[in-house]
Amino acid sequence: QSATNRYSSDNGATWSSGTTSETSTYYGVTYGNNTFIALGTSNLLKSTDNGSNWTTITTVNLYDVAFGDSTFIGCGADGAMYTSNDNGSSWTSRTSGASANSLYGITHGNNRFISVGSSGKLIKSTDNGSSWGNVNSTVSNSLNSVAYGNNIFVAVGSNTVIASTDNTGSTFGIK
C-alpha cells in the first residue's frame, strides 16, 4: 500500500499528488541544498524534485531534522542522532550523550545545532553534529521544539517556554 503526498510548485497556489511506497508516520521535514528530507517512525526519505517523488534512504526512528552549514541532522528516541553531509544520500550515527532522553526537536542557527528533548534535555554541537555537549538550563520539563531567530534560540515544551541568554545557545532561561 502506498501513501499519498501533496506538493506545490507554485508557492501553494495549487497542489498535485505524488506517491511514495511508505506508510510510516512522519514527524519532521526540512529543506536544504535543493533537497527535502522527511523522517519518522521507521524511515528517512529524500526528494530532489520538489516533493514529487521520495526515495527511502535508511530505516531509522527519528522525530525531527534540521539543515545548516551544508549538513542535515536528525534526532530521535534514546538520544539518537544522525548526520549527513552529502545531501542526505548517506547518514552517520553520532553519539549525542543523551541516551537516557528522547530528542524531539533540533534547529540550526549561528553556526551551531541545538537539540531538545525529554526531561528538559538541551544539547549543542558546534562541529556539525560530530560531537555534542550539554547546555545550561534549570528546566526539567520535556522540551518538544526549538527555533532560532533574531539572534536567540527559543525552546518550548510541557508548560515551558525558554530562551537562550545570547546567540551562542550556551545558557537558557525561563521566559
Residue ranges and their predicted role:
Residues 1-175:
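Residue-level hotspots at or immediately adjacent to binding/recognition sites across diverse folds
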